[in-house]
Amino acid sequence: RFTAMALDLLPSLEARIESSADPFDAAVRLAIAGNIIDLGVDGDLSEEEALRAMEEALDIPVAGDVKAFSEAVRPAQSILYLADNAGEIVFDRPLLRTLPGGRIAFAVRGAPVINDAVMRDALAAGIDGLVTVIDNGSDAPGTILEDCGDEFLEAFGGADLIISKGQGNYETLCDEDAPIFFLFKVKCPAVERHSGLPLGTHALLRGRGFS
């Protein structure tokens, strides 16, 4: 349901991005705004509410350094993009299109858990038409490296840049010494405390792998 809704909303949101003064910044904002499509938080979200929320989100400043993120993206030869929820991955497509040529892998969960994206969701969202899709070999919410498969761990260890979507990935990877940028909306008190950002913040945080 959420993937179909997101695909219906995407063209109008892409038009907003293309007409913006800074399409990269707008694509980042949309990717974070997509984080509202979370059955664990907004299970009864209507299409009209989702469109309104994401159009409004394109005007919400991101708490973080978009320029630094852009500068990290530009030279990267191998990028790993960690997916979050099933419907929201549609809204990762504009940001995926801005990434440079080279090896880009989009990682989903290895098996269904809560509303996290799995392989069939990525295929339904058309992600495989843009980049390589892999699964992490795990059914844990978030990304627990000890539970992940060899293909994913090779991609994780070999990536010049890791783009991590959602709170679950932030909570499980924030202490890793890896070149990660975290994109998420602060939705719970635990993440509010850890990140130091207020509830509702649209966050873009650099991981420990960046000096």
Can you annotate each of these PLM segments?
Residues S70, R93-R97, M119, F152-L153, ...:
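Short amphipathic alpha-helical segments and helix-helix/interface helices
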Residues R1-A76:
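Electropositive, gly/pro-rich neighborhoods at or near active sites that engage anionic ligands
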Residues A63, I89-V90, V113-D116:
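Loop/helix-junction capping segments adjacent to catalytic residues or to phosphate/diphosphate-binding pockets
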Residues V108-I114, D121-S211:
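C-terminal functional extensions of proteins
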Residues S78-L80, D160-L161:
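Structural motif
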Residues L82-A105:
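Histidine-anchored nucleotide/phosphate-binding helix
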Residues Q77-S78, G102-A105, P179:
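Residues at the starts of beta-strands that form the adenosine-phosphate
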